[in-house]
Amino acid sequence: HWIIQGMLSLTDIRRIIQSGKPIVWTMHDMWPFTGICHYAGDCDKYATQCHNCPQLYKGSRKDIAYRTFQKKKKLFEGAQITFVACSRWLESLAKKSDLIKGQTITNIPNAINTNLFKPRDKKQAREKCHLPQDKKLLLFGSVKITDKRKGIDYLVSACKQIASSYPDFSKELGVVVFGNQAEQYASLFPFPIYPMNYVSNEKELVDIYNAVDLYVTPSLQDNLPNTIVEAMACGIPCIGFNVGGIPQMIDHLHNGYVAEYQSSKDLANGIHWALTEGEYESLSEEACRKAVSSYSESTIAKKYVEIYNKITGNHA
């Protein structure tokens, strides 16, 4: 995942390539096929040659993005690498990059433990999490709440629109937020907010998912968010923007709602629809079914075994 930051350098990767063995590289973001960035945003220079990087304070024609792109390109020449993206969206971006042209590029989603992440009693979950029993609860989570890419501002705006358009319905709502700096947004929501701060214990996370009614992820650019799969596995319908790998995970009006990109209004529509017009029990059952059938550890393991057998010539 994060192969740099003192874990694996380009020199280390070179040594692995020089072993002559076939390599399977799982991509969790765009770094393997860009100069230096993990998410390129609106920039598409990685398709041909990174330079004048918009993420650098002073990008230039031969900045560090340019130089690293060149190093990677030389590194990958002649290598036998199968790049596995975690979403069809990331796979499509990777195939545009000149950096890994000629390499095998495919996609396999992340796996989750569906024996742990599964539906549990909502009343008991709320008691454990000290959450009210009489509210319809929305959940938003991120390691860093203030990361603009995660889109919490759109959720705040959507909640304000709900409060304005559906005043009676809005009285039933509350927002559960997990992640660092959650308290900073408490005063911005028109509904009660219940900060959970940073959650590192998976069992506690399972309780939080089971305690809520909807998981809302207004992310502006994301690969295949584990939080969506985890919530779905617990039978929680999800709402998210039509971006990245999100529409691959959420089947619109079937197990959740895929909102128009960067539209707080449609995000609000999705929240209201799921909790008032949609058949909630059916949404919940389909969310759980999708998670188990598509993202269980056994399902994903079989897909990787197929790749390993193919690149090693073992077709048994």
Q: Residue spans of the language-model regions?
A:
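A short, active-site helix/loop in glycosyltransferases that binds the activated sugar's phosphate group
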Residues: 34-39, 59-104, 112-116, 122
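Conserved donor-binding/catalytic core segment of Leloir-type glycosyltransferases
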Residues: 131-150, 156-160
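Nucleotide-activated donor-binding/catalytic signature segment of Leloir-type glycosyltransferases, i.e.
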Residues: 166-172, 177-206
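Short alpha-helical donor nucleotide-sugar binding micro-motif in glycosyltransferases
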Residues: 207-212, 304
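Aromatic "clamp/platform" in nucleotide-sugar-dependent glycosyltransferases that forms part
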Residues: 220
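Short hydrophobic beta-strand element within catalytic cores of glycosyltransferases
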Residues: 237-240
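Conserved acidic donor-binding segment of nucleotide-sugar-dependent glycosyltransferases
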Residues: 252-253, 257-264, 273-278
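A short, well-ordered alpha-helix in the C-terminal region of glycosyltransferases
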Residues: 266, 279-294, 303-306
